[in-house]
Amino acid sequence: MDTARAALTRADEALAAAVREAGFSADDFKPAYRCPLCEDTGMRGGVPCRCVADAARRLRRDEINAASPLGLCQFASFEVERYSDAVEPELGISPREYMGKLLNYCRGYAAKFSQNSPNLLFMGHTGLGKTHLALAIADAVLEGGHDVLYTSAAALAAQLGREHFNYTTNDEWLAACQEADLLILDDLGTEYITPLTISVLYELINTRMLTHRPTIYTTNITDQSVFVARYTEKVASRMLGGCKMFKFFGTDQRLK
């Protein structure tokens, strides 16, 4: 055994000498791992390495940027100065002051996000910043290490319809929407309504509420009676009753 060890040692020394003579170092032959922590195995100390979460977060960012009209936004780019400083009678303060307070609320929501965070409903006319703030929350929550999924209501309804009539997909999109830590459901009211849409929407809302997974909804619908007429009292009650609602004021910011 000692003889074999000695032979291996001599072989190692000879190889090292040959490498040096060729102008290389031993480090030149080490694998170039993308992640030196787990050496590209994805596991470290019996748990998933942080590189796995980083990769998943990058993929989610790419998905959201491709699916949303604005891409991921940041709170810093939300310009409250663009809102009127004239007092809005319904508010008792100006839209600028109101939106500044709402911006601060959203910052705090994202910073303290957890399963106990409330559902949010952003309602108001087109171009008032609903999607911007929802996507800014998404960006910050992603950075906090949570899984975030974005979909427009129209895209959700279309995808769920395809899955319903394709028995090979096993409702994968619905499952993803149900399981994300935070779901952004944008532009409610633009989707094509069918009995299937109503049924699946109720299932999605109910499942997420029962499993304490927050959802942020945005919509141009500001009249609750219109909500009820469109989505049925059962769905509207489940959605509106479980949300902290914010109405957006001002004029279309995209026209300025």
Residue ranges and their predicted role:
Residues 75-120:
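Pre-Walker A (pre-P-loop) alpha-helix and adjacent loop at the N terminus of AAA/AAA+ ATPase modules
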Residues 87-100, 142-179:
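Short glycine-rich substrate-engagement loop in P-loop NTPases that contacts/grips substrate
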Residues 118, 146-147, 179-182, 211-217:
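Loop/turn-to-beta-strand initiation segments
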Residues 23-74:
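Interdomain "pre-motor" coupling segment immediately N-terminal to P-loop NTPase/helicase cores
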Residues 2-36:
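Short, charged low-complexity linear segments at domain edges
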Residues 116-133:
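Walker A/P-loop nucleotide-binding motif
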